Swiss-Prot record:
Keywords attached to this entry: Cobalamin biosynthesis, Glutamine amidotransferase
Record lineage: Bacteria, Bacillati, Actinomycetota, Actinomycetes, Mycobacteriales
Protein name: Cobyric acid synthase
Gene Ontology MF terms in the entry: ABC-type vitamin B12 transporter activity; catalytic activity
PANTHER family given in the database record: COBYRIC ACID SYNTHASE (PTHR21343:SF1), DETHIOBIOTIN SYNTHETASE (PTHR21343)
UniProt entry tagged with the keyword Phosphoprotein: no
Domain of life: Bacteria
InterPro entries: Class_I_gatase-like (IPR029062), CobQ/CobB/MinD/ParA_Nub-bd_dom (IPR002586), CobQ_GATase1 (IPR033949), CobQ_synth (IPR004459), GATase_3 (IPR011698), P-loop_NTPase (IPR027417)
Length: 496
């Protein structure tokens, strides 16, 4: 097999596309194939820095890891980073090219389509298989004219399409049927079959519904992946970051006490994955919060990154969270700001890049000033600590103590521009010891055996195992080798 490719589309956002692609990459590598992930266009503020010094979606970095590859801009040539409700920063081949309004995006389509086609063609020449991920859902037919990642990509590259859906949300059979039904006949012809994700219970109870789905659509279901609560790292979509929701699956504490973490769910949150390493720790309970009352009883408050720092800072004040964070810090308890969250902790922010508000006061918990530069900083660090930087804001003045060469601190208030910092196991353990001491949690015991990197690989191995055990892998390999088989067109009122 050389240059085989398929597209994993979804009934909705957060249906399981990213993890299915990652699991397929890991499984095919196990089978001796060279594999690359590909997402033509991603809309996400969860991003990573590549070996070329560019920027791609974090999910594609995870999928590259699954395939045994370093992250590359080739795997996600178009990245849209929403900074407001109607505009996004446009990143092409890893570099910012400007901002684009949703209504104007169609004017860029031809150029971007050529970039996508070039990168996919190159990957197909270099790898045995390319596993592509769609965006959102192909059922969003209002976006078909500008689509580069779903059926627009599949039609341009003649890719067979597998549609995956999350049955845990309910209504999946209707979603699968309807997704195919609303497509144009030429797009329908590429949809080869379905995958059911996150099924709880006895799969035999689902069998009659899948048989009827096959009769209605003329397409098989390649398998049913069971729900598994260990698969939660590297969340792709902000829809997964729900206010009040727990991060991960909390493990029992090693000592007599737990640590409670309140992570602020900013409206324009970016790189929410930074806090996942905390949730890997036994006895650490991490919850997304949006109200000042939710800070009560927290041992640690985390302000994550933001694609609109000044706007989200104003939101903190409007929600009463700014005052709550200040009170938390005044009580001597720990606060961590990452990237945009770090900038919010400072005294002043001068931002002519992402905001029209100019110079504004920060929370003042760190005596430092931030100035935004037009040129974005993109850095990937490996030694002695590993992490990466993606930011316009620069520290212009500081009267605070340096924190490990990667940030600033005042007492138990910490700030850093580094994403992925808490993935460094030894640093995280030492820092959690400080956090517990500041909170008076003498009965909290930091585990000495948590390896976040190994946990990520174990998750990818688990996803590959689930695919191998529950999907028709032979049929999927046939799609890669032979393309889309003939499938009937579904006649609906849309196509009459």
């Amino acid at each position: 097999m050389t240059g085989g490719a398929l597209l994993v589309a979804g009934t909705t956002s957060d249906a399981g596309k990213s993890m299915l692609v990652g699991g397929l990459c890991r499984l095919l590598v196990r089978k001796g194939l060279s594999v690359a992930p590909f997402k033509a266009q991603n809309m996400s503020n969860n991003s990573a820095v590549t070996v070329e010094g560019g920027e791609i979606g974090r999910a594609q970095a995870m999928q590259a890891r699954a395939a045994g590859l370093a992250p590359s801009v080739r795997f996600n040539p178009i990245l849209l980073k929403p900074g407001g409700d109607r505009t996004s920063q446009l990143v092409v081949r890893g570099q910012v090219t400007g901002s684009v309004a949703a209504a104007d995006y169609i004017n860029h389509r031809d150029h971007l389509a050529a970039v996508v086609a070039d990168e996919l063609s190159s990957l197909r020449e270099d790898f045995d298989a390319v596993i592509c991920e769609g965006a959102g859902s192909p059922a969003e037919i209002n976006l078909r004219a500008t689509d580069l990642a779903n059926m627009g990509l599949a039609r341009a590259a003649a890719l067979p399409v597998i549609v995956v859906g999350d049955i845990d949300r309910g209504g999946l059979l209707a979603h699968l049927h309807g997704t195919v039904a609303v497509l144009e006949p030429a797009d329908q012809a590429l949809v080869s079959g379905f995958v059911v994700n996150k099924f709880r219970g006895d799969p035999s109870l689902l069998a009659p519904g899948l048989r009827q789905l096959a009769e209605l659509t003329g397409r098989p279901t390649y398998g049913v992946i069971p729900f598994h609560d260990e698969i939660w790292l590297d969340t792709e979509d902000s829809v997964s970051v729900r206010p009040g929701g727990l991060v991960g699956a909390p493990e029992p504490p090693r000592g007599e006490q737990t640590l409670t973490v309140a992570a602020i769910r900013l409206p324009r949150i970016s790189n929410s994955t930074d806090i996942e390493a905390l949730a890997c720790e036994p006895g650490v309970v991490v919850r997304w919060v949006t109200d000042a009352a939710d800070l009560t009883g927290a041992d640690l408050v985390v302000i994550p990154g933001s694609k609109a720092t000044v706007t989200d800072l104003r939101w903190l004040r409007e929600r009463g969270l700014a005052a709550g964070i200040a009170a938390h810090a005044a009580a001597g308890r720990a606060v961590l700001g990452v990237c945009g969250g770090f900038q919010m902790l400072c005294s002043r922010i001068d931002d002519p890049v992402e905001s029209r508000e100019g110079r504004v006061d920060g929370l003042g918990l760190l005596d430092a000033d931030i100035e935004f530069a037009a040129q974005k900083t993109l850095r990937h660090w490996e030694t002695p600590l590993h992490g990466y930087e993606i930011h316009h804001g620069q520290v212009a003045r500081s009267a605070e103590t340096d924190w490990l060469g990667i940030g600033l601190r005042r007492g138990a208030v910490y700030g850093t521009h580094w994403h992925g910092l808490l993935d460094n196991d030894a640093l995280r353990r030492d820092w959690l010891t400080e956090v517990a001491a500041a909170a008076g949690r003498d009965g909290f015991v930091v585990a000495d055996d948590v390896d976040v990197s190994a946990r990520r690989d174990a998750q990818l191995d688990l996803m590959a195992d689930l695919i191998e055990n529950h999907l028709d892998v032979g049929a999927i390999l046939d799609l890669l080798e032979h393309g889309a088989p003939h499938r009937p067109t579904m006649s609906t009122a849309l196509h009459v």
